[in-house]
């Protein structure tokens, strides 16, 4: 079984492609709450995605493992980030994990929601910053997802983006 934690980036700076101070604090706080140790980290090309991963891992008190920038996490694929394209991208990330491995991927809304729909056929409510889905692929290839939601007081909203 492989596991991929796919999250939306934290709160961004309204004037640049980086996290705001609130976003850095949020990513670190969410990272502190994890009990997982990651074998691989994937981020979209956006600076705010890489920063989210860095602050998340800082909160989790983990070193940056093997990592990659994945354009598909920003919707840059042949399908333009369609549900099917995002689902295929998630499967490809799962394939890059070691057997029984755990990965962390940082993407954007609505792309995480599209991936969930492409994998399950079930729509989900829009994600707030640092929320996401936990994707489990069993040895027989069966995929299950679980929503990762934060308490309302933990999130400072910014506008939806890709």
Regions found by a protein language model. Name each.
Residues 160-162:
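Glycogenin-like
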Residues 146-158:
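Short, solvent-exposed aromatic-acidic interface loops
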Residues 67-68, 141-143, 153-154:
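Residue-level marker of intrinsically disordered, low-complexity segments enriched
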Residues 65, 74, 95, 149-151:
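Compositionally biased amphipathic helical and low-complexity segments enriched in hydrophobic
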Residues 1-85, 119-137, 158:
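Active-site-proximal alpha-helix that buttresses catalytic centers in soluble enzyme cores
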């Amino acid at each position: 079984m492989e596991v991929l934690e796919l999250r939306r980036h934290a709160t961004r700076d309204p004037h640049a492609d980086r996290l705001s101070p609130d976003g850095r604090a949020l990513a670190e706080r969410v990272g502190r709450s994890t009990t997982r140790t990651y074998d691989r980290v994937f981020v979209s090309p956006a600076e705010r995605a890489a920063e989210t991963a860095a602050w998340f891992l800082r909160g989790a008190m983990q070193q940056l493992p093997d990592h990659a920038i994945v354009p598909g996490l920003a919707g840059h694929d042949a399908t333009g980030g369609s549900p099917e394209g995002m689902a295929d991208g998630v499967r490809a990330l799962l394939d890059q994990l070691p057997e029984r491995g755990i990965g962390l991927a940082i993407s954007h809304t609505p792309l995480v929601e599209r991936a969930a729909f492409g994998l399950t056929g079930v729509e989900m409510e829009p994600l707030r910053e640092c929320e996401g889905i936990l994707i489990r692929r069993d040895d027989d290839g069966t995929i299950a997802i679980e929503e990762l939601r934060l308490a309302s007081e933990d999130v400072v909203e910014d506008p939806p983006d890709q």
